[in-house]
UniProtKB/Swiss-Prot annotation:
Pfam families: NdhN (PF11909). Transmembrane segments: none annotated. Its main location: membrane. The keyword Membrane applies. Its EC number is 7.1.1.-. NDH-1 can be composed of about 15 different subunits; different subcomplexes with different compositions have been identified which probably have different functions. It comes from Trichormus variabilis (strain ATCC 29413 / PCC 7937). This is NAD(P)H-quinone oxidoreductase subunit N. Belongs to the complex I NdhN subunit family.
Amino acid sequence: MALITTGNGLIRDLEKFGSVGVYVPLEGGFEGRYRRRLRAAGYTTLQFTARGLGDVAAYLTGVHGVRPPHLGKKSSGNGAAVGNVYYLPPIVGSQLEHLPPKSKGLVLWIIEGHILSDQEVEFLTDLPKLEPRVKVVVERGGDRTFRWKALKDTFSASYQAV
C-alpha cells in the first residue's frame, strides 16, 4: 500500500457495488483513514460492531426491542425478570432523516463482520438496493494490506453453491 492513498478506488467501488467487504491489517488504523476519506467525499459514516447485533434486518430497518444489561439485578415487577424492553427506532431510517442536506448518503461501516452469517451478509448486500442513499462496508477479515471486493463475492463457498 502506498504511503499516501486517496481512497478513490474504494469510494468508486462502493458507489458501483453499493456494498463492499474489506480485509484490514490486524494492527488497525487503516479503517480510520478510509472513513475520513469517505467523509471528505461527502458521505456520513456510522461505525458499529457486528457482535451482539442480533437480527440485522430488524436492527437496521425496523423498530426493535432491546433490554439493557441487568447486571445481576432482577426487577420486582410482574414482567420478565431481566428487565423491561425498550423499543428503538430503525437505525438506518433515523440516520437518513438527520443527514446534512449536501450529503451523498450514509455509509454503514460494520467492524468484526467475519462473525455474520451468509444470510445476514446477503441482507447487507441487498440493503443499498432497498435504500439507494445507504452504502455498506463490512470488515470480513484480516490481511497484510487493506483490500476490498464486492460484498457479494465474500460469501462462503458452500453458500454460493446453494
